[in-house]
């Protein structure tokens, strides 16, 4: 016989059999080695074919191994091993069988048929296990499905559905899919399209995370439960694994062969199989090399004829980018748009998933946590979609509580660390012999004993709580498993088993769960509990705060006091601007108490006043107050935006322009730090068109960047500073605040458009500074110098008379507080730098600055 007529799979089996024979020191290549090679290869299909024929495969494997072990061994065997006479006879019978069946190639299943016809040892083993010529022939016909072997790789194309798909209906039967709540309209529309005669292929289109794949899982569950029209009952829903199709397709045409195998299997199934292709846009161009067809083009004829019942899922952007471009592919699909669910629908979805997450994490998820997850994710996580982002919050909060539960509680950890510290101290003190050391040793022993007792008590409580909690979690898991078995029994029509499970097993487990919950409640008072065993709204708020940097959690007493005393804190840095400080403080208090409009920024202000009076300093103080750091101050110098086209730098260049990928300075900063103070400095110097983009920010708290993404400004404070009208403020001095503001507003109305002024929460006019204000600012600035000197182990003391001289030197009604900085530099810092370099001051010494007439002297 010609070996080139053997299929690739059988050639591989012969090579493997030769290796087995060499390893066994056999003198010939026996048929038994080939049978073992075929049975050991998972992809050969030999074991499956024998099982299909009703043969006891484990018995065959066991007897075959015994037979091979009993074969005579020849030591020193080298080179190729020749086939035995029996094997040659089997191969000749295979050739005859292939010719009889009209095959161009000899497939490995014919080896099993020929072996049964022979009377050698391997053939006898098969016959004893139940193999006959008739049942092997019938099994071959069933596996081939009426097709001939006309290709060396024909065996690889068999069972293509098993290799390249995942059975979603089977997963639904096994209870491995999450429950799908709602989405009835979309599922009904998909079923409607699937029932069409031709082009019965729905494609689910929606934003990422809205639940497209969940709709298909919902359809699988409905098919399993028989809640679909007659034409869809008992159908299988398979997920195509495109990655498995492409993986390992080394040679040209191999990918097409695999896909053709899948399509042939589907055609043979006579419409009883639905295929789901997630991320269907990946079909366009998949497997395309020079001159080859891509998967999309190969599927078109089957889709058009209605042979392929396909459900696709993709996002709006990818549908537009890939599928709409190919009009012939697009017309074969029917669009089913999947929108984002509302907050109410998301709450219902989360309630449906609650039990699955409780079982996975082994903790309880409260209803307030579910409501908080839906509402907070909708408000604060703006770049993603419901229900995905709400599910993420629940999952992460539960994961955090589980992690705390499985690690040592904080109270025990503190005692543990203290014990380590005391034992180290004890080891050192024991070496000393004086009375003080002995006394200290007694105290250490006493403290160690006390802490060990406390630790043992806490450990006992912790273990008891953990045991109760783990027990309750285990019972929940068992309840879930019983519910799945009840559903399976109902589907199979075994009502006796279903009622036994429901009224005996389930009731018993429910009683156990109730008892475990009571034990958990009674075991310790809430105040003494070491373990957190449930997820509440506060835990969800903590996760949102960590993800976004926005303080969402309930205000602690400390923060309430801080907000009530906000003016006092800001006045430590900003001197003499009572109206401005009050306006900013009121805006922050409104937002943190939840009274502010949630669709607008926390506050938007226009600060007007002469240079150096504290406009920018107030913004820095505000950022420091809110975030304990000035890093959250986004400062934009508007003098850099004098040209009309400079607006692109704020929101990002439009498509087609250089820098499109980089994004805008303002939008990118706010996306990274959504809770910020935005300072638009010297706003009057910018081009008037730049203000047009600020209109929607001030009104709706949102801005669309160059890439079409919506950036959320609802958690920002927007401050614009300007010198407009500063000449009036200087002329009128500290008169009636409202009169000064009225005059300044006339200038503002000339420069800014009415729609801009109308959207600003408050226009705040800053006063010019008087001598007393400058003296207070001098104190603040000298404190900064004191801190810098402290790092060098030096102290600074400035007398009141010296402070008066500095304030007088730094006072200029036109330039505000900025000349003061220069005065401190020239009068104190310059001479002090020389003295330090000369080594006039030793470490730990005090530098006293005193008045000497109109000059300063250092002592």
Curated annotation (Swiss-Prot):
Protein's UniProt name: Chaperone protein ClpB
Region feature (Repeat 1): 6-71
Residue stretches making up the Clp R domain: 3-146
Region (C-terminal): 769-859
TM annotation in the entry: none
Subcellular location: Cytoplasm
Entry's family note: Belongs to the ClpA/ClpB family.
NCBIfam families: chaperone_ClpB (TIGR03346)
Annotated organism of origin: Neisseria meningitidis serogroup A / serotype 4A (strain DSM 15465 / Z2491)
Residues at which ATP 1 binds: 206-213
